[in-house]
Amino acid sequence: SSTCIIKYPPGWHRNFTEYVLTDEEFYVLEGEISINNISYEVDTYAHLPSGFQRDSMISKNGAVLLTFFGGTLNINKSKENHSYDKKRLVLKTSAKDAEWNNVDLDALGLKEISSGSRLLSLFVDPLNNEITYLTGSVPFKAAQFPERHPVAQEFYVLGGVLAGNCGIMQAGAYCWRPPMVVHGPYGSPTGALILLRSIGGPLTTEIFPAVEHSYQPEHKPVLPSNLSEVGKIGIDLPKRY
């Protein structure tokens, strides 16, 4: 599996039938792309299961997509039909137009720490109950409780500023967290929009006793050894004037 940002240049197109033989999940960060004459603009999402047929893809003016592949990328251009699990298809969801707060907070164990946010479930896998969802955090409504999960979790900050136990994250920041790693609490001085995914099964949450949250935490990212030097580079927040 892989998580990547894919940039499609203006005029990019594929006008033939093909099948991607792994799950592809994406969220549009910039621009617009059309698949099978369905237009995906900024802040739209899709989950296209393995074997989903694509007859055309085009990006007239270019697009940037946050993309998740469920396995090794394998594209089949043969005329042989491939089946796919229709229960795992999310053809298009617009974050702007969707009905938010469609998440079972009790099942996820997030009720105690979600008072300062609202959630939008984008996809729940019927095979293993992995979930992809958006969290919109309001300004100056920080959580108080550290937490951990029995499954891996990754998230990408789509907008705003998020302050947590490893420092400040802003738009474009990414985190991969293995199972059972204690993290948080988080809060935002500006409001933040975050896309999160659980990997390895259903998301549940263990809550720890309350601690003090800081909106100006020390910058101390946890990184693989080959990225340790990158973690020492400070990134200034955008100026207000």
Where are these regions (language model features)?
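A short, N-terminal "cap"/entry segment at the start of jelly-roll beta-barrel domains
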Residues: 1, 75-129, 220-241
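Residues at beta-strand starts and edge strands
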Residues: 1-2, 27, 61, 129-131, ...
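Conserved short histidine dyad/triad with adjacent acidic residue
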Residues: 1-20, 32-34, 38-42, 49, ...
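Ligand-binding loop in jelly-roll beta-barrel domains
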Residues: 22, 39-40, 50-79, 151, ...
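Short, structured motif recognition centered on aromatic/hydrophobic residues
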Residues: 26-30, 45, 154-159, 174, ...
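Hydrophobic alpha-helical segments
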Residues: 211-213
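Alpha-helical scaffold repeats of the Armadillo/HEAT/TPR superfamily
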Residues: 216-218
